């Protein structure tokens, strides 16, 4: 169990700095906005010491619902900047000392704050017009006399040369927009615009029963749908004290690793296409089809499987599942060597990727950039090793870590992880025990009152679920720690002083999925 601390708002920044420096809580795992009704509006922080893996949960609140304000911690953890903007967007809490207090997902002309419990949906009818572009942001600071003042600051100066990459650009891999300030071909500033595919999934969860919420996780990172749902099921099961059978743990682990291979093959294909290597693009898609066939035979779905459920999985594995998985692994190993011959060793690929988009280990931790991006920067951040779940504590595998922090390191981490995923599957596939594939659950699932957090290692990093329950059949608050939001928050750091063409390579190797960012 994690240690839990409540800190008064006026002491928050001081105490958080002590936790960061004194207790080495250098990783901000999750930052969640909350509406506790009459008890006020607030934030829950999940912190971790990357050396000892000790976790602390911190909460703070303000009772001023008319003009809620809390100190910003974005100067302590860089990843807090986008997370605090999200909280402002959803709850209207303004963070004093935050450098860019704009909405993150919603339009600037949006009325109200949708995750507040007293939010009135009628205030925002469907708009049929574009929003007016705004090139300013607000900065809130405390004066020496204790008064709070607001400042308006311009994001880009009038004499800066600005171009838009996205939201309708093939290399952004979805509806994401980068506003880029250029000096010649050199990137001087990058402003990320999210929210084009925001669907209000966390708000929707509050009016759904727990089994109904499961389908929404598949609509986040759709290339890690099985892993996302695994995290949510695990969070609910742990909260209820439900132990799934060992057979289920084996199946979930194997399916998670097949999903990881599937995602990394797609990463390889898309990066090759971005770099102009069309032949290699087809190689990855050709081989990925074999995994989708395996998924379809057992789950009925290819891209989105709808397979995990509370207490187990929806159906037992297909009769030929074991055979097909073993055949696929035997097929893919020699194919990976071919990938490296076609693309990895190519001099153009190496020139485009090596030394480009460098992210230091310290910045990776500060931004919370987990997954292949963090491990390429020398940070051993794999949830399967840090906090083992399912069968990961009983299998032998190597955590792939590189230290260069550039595009080529991020590429190689993912390619080498395919081999590790195959090794994990081979240790399990012939030893799946007999047993139930689903535990018997009550018709109406009620999670005991309390706060819960569970995380898995998704294809792009830590995917976490924070759940607050009041003992009802609906979640009081369900927050998803998207793997992609910390990644895009680090994009400006990686792109600054790079060439505009390098933006494509950097975005491709970061490997974000836009619906996962926007939720």
UniProtKB/Swiss-Prot annotation:
Q: Which GO terms describe its cellular component?
A: NADH dehydrogenase complex; plasma membrane
Residue ranges, annotated region (NADH dehydrogenase I subunit C) = 1-138
Q: Which UniProt keywords apply?
A: Cell inner membrane, Cell membrane, Membrane, Multifunctional enzyme, NAD, Quinone, Translocase, Transport
InterPro entries, alphabetically?
Answer: NADH_Q_OxRdtase_suD (IPR001135), NADH_quin_OxRdtase_su_C/D-like (IPR037232), NADH_UbQ_OxRdtase_30kDa_su (IPR001268), NDH-1_subunit_CD (IPR026662), NDH1_su_D/H (IPR022885), NiFe-Hase_large (IPR029014)
Q: How does it sit in the membrane?
A: Peripheral membrane protein
Could you tell me what reaction this enzyme catalyses? a quinone + NADH + 5 H(+)(in) = a quinol + NAD(+) + 4 H(+)(out)
One Pfam family it belongs to: Complex1_49kDa
Name the enzyme group at the top EC level. Answer: translocase
**Entry's localization field:** Cell inner membrane
Q: Which domain of life is it from?
A: Bacteria
Q: Which parts of this chain are annotated as the region NADH dehydrogenase I subunit D? A: 159-519
Instruction: Cite the EC number.
Output: 7.1.1.-
Q: Which Gene3D superfamilies does the UniProt entry name for this protein? A: Cytochrome-c3 Hydrogenase, chain B, NADH:ubiquinone oxidoreductase, 30kDa subunit
Q: Please list the GO terms describing molecular function.
A: NAD binding; NADH dehydrogenase (ubiquinone) activity; NADH:ubiquinone reductase (non-electrogenic) activity; quinone binding
The record's comment on protein family reads: In the N-terminal section; belongs to the complex I 30 kDa subunit family. In the C-terminal section; belongs to the complex I 49 kDa subunit family.
**Primary role:** NDH-1 shuttles electrons from NADH, via FMN and iron-sulfur (Fe-S) centers, to quinones in the respiratory chain. The immediate electron acceptor for the enzyme in this species is believed to be a menaquinone. Couples the redox reaction to proton translocation (for every two electrons transferred, four hydrogen ions are translocated across the cytoplasmic membrane), and thus conserves the redox energy in a proton gradient.
Assembly and interactions?
NDH-1 is composed of 13 different subunits. Subunits NuoB, CD, E, F, and G constitute the peripheral sector of the complex.
Protein name as annotated: NADH-quinone oxidoreductase subunit C/D
Q: Which organism is it from?
A: Phocaeicola vulgatus (strain ATCC 8482 / DSM 1447 / JCM 5826 / CCUG 4940 / NBRC 14291 / NCTC 11154)
């Amino acid at each position: 169990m994690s240690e839990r601390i409540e800190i008064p708002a006026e002491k928050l920044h001081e105490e958080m700095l002590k936790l960061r420096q004194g207790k080495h809580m250098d990783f901000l795992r999750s930052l969640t906005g909350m509406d506790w009704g009459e008890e006020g509006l607030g934030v829950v922080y999940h912190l971790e010491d990357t050396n000892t893996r000790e976790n602390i949960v911190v909460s703070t609140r303000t009772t001023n619902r008319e003009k809620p304000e809390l100190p910003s911690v974005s100067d302590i953890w860089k990843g807090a900047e986008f997370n605090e903007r999200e909280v402002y967007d959803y709850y209207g809490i303004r963070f004093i000392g935050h450098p860019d207090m704009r909405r993150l997902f919603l339009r600037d002309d949006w009325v109200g704050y949708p995750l507040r419990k007293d939010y009135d949906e009628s205030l925002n009818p469907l708009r049929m017009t574009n929003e007016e572009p705004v090139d300013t942001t607000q900065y809130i600071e405390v004066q020496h006399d204790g008064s709070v003042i607001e400042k308006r600051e311009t994001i880009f100066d009038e004499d800066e040369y600005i171009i838009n990459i996205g939201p309708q650009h093939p290399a952004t891999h979805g509806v994401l927009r980068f506003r880029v300030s250029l000096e010649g071909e050199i990137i001087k500033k990058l402003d990320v615009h999210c929210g084009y595919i925001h669907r209000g999934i966390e708000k929707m969860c509050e009016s759904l029963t727990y089994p109904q919420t499961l389908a929404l996780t598949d609509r986040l990172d759709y290339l890690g749908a099985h892993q996302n749902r695994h995290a949510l099921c695990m969070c609910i099961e742990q909260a209820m004290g439900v132990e799934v059978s060992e057979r289920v743990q084996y199946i979930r682990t194997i399916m998670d690793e097949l999903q990881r291979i599937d995602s990394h093959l797609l990463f390889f294909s898309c990066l090759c296409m971005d770099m102009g290597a069309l032949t290699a693009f087809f190689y990855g898609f050709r081989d990925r089809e074999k995994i989708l066939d395996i998924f379809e035979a057992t789950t009925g779905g290819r891209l989105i499987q709808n397979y995990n459920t509370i207490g187990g999985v929806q159906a037992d594995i297909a009769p030929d599942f074991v055979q097909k998985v073993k055949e696929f692994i035997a097929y893919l190993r020699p194919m990976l060597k071919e990938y490296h011959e076609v693309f990895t060793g190519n001099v153009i690929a190496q020139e485009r990727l090596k030394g480009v988009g460098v992210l230091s280990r310290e910045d990776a931790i500060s931004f919370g950039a987990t997954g292949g991006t963090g491990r390429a920067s020398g940070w051993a951040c794999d949830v399967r090793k840090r906090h083992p779940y399912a069968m990961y504590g009983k299998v032998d595998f190597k955590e792939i870590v590189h230290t260069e922090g550039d595009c080529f390191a991020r590429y190689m981490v993912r390619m080498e992880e395919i081999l590790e995923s195959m090794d994990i599957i081979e240790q399990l596939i012939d030893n799946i025990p007999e047993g139930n594939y689903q535990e018997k659950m009550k018709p109406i699932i009620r999670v005991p009152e309390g706060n819960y957090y569970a995380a898995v290692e998704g294809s792009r990093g830590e995917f976490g679920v924070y759940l607050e329950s009041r003992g009802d059949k609906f979640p009081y608050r369900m927050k998803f720690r998207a793997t992609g939001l910390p990644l895009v928050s680090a994009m400006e750091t990686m792109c600054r002083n790079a060439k505009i063409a390098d933006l494509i390579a950097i975005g491709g190797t970061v490997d974000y999925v836009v619906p996962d960012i926007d939720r």
